[in-house]
Amino acid sequence: MGTSAIKYFDLKQFRTTGYRFDFKKMLDDKGNTAVYLFYSYVRICSIYRKLNLSQSDIDELVKTKKIEIKEKAEKNLVNHLLLFNDVIDEVLKDLALNLLCDYVYGIATKFSEFYEACKIQGNDSRILITELCKRFMKLSFDLLSLTPIEKI
């Protein structure tokens, strides 16, 4: 996690701006840090373990169920997830990986709001939204060359 924390702290800065190297800020578990992002990712993995859901169970839900958005937190999260292609276009146009960092941080914060506001257990639609978050976070981590963890 340490290497990813340093790498993320560097990538979240706009490429032409300087910053002060600060381990304390890099390893903070609050705010726009790799530790916070990994905590959100671990939370998703933990939800699946708690609900006894295997990846094949989730894949079956993806094939057979639909997402129904009823709550504001669900809408905010899904709308943010849908920005992915636009964010990637901007990253490529401006050579600004910090925009992808902001995007994945947005997923983490909006997922936290969703988790607090919406009961996931027993709701296939919310499990699917959770899976979307996991997949977009994993894809973002891969693009940023960060190695996520599934347990803390």
What is each stretch, according to the model?
Residues 2-152:
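Non-catalytic interaction-recognition regions
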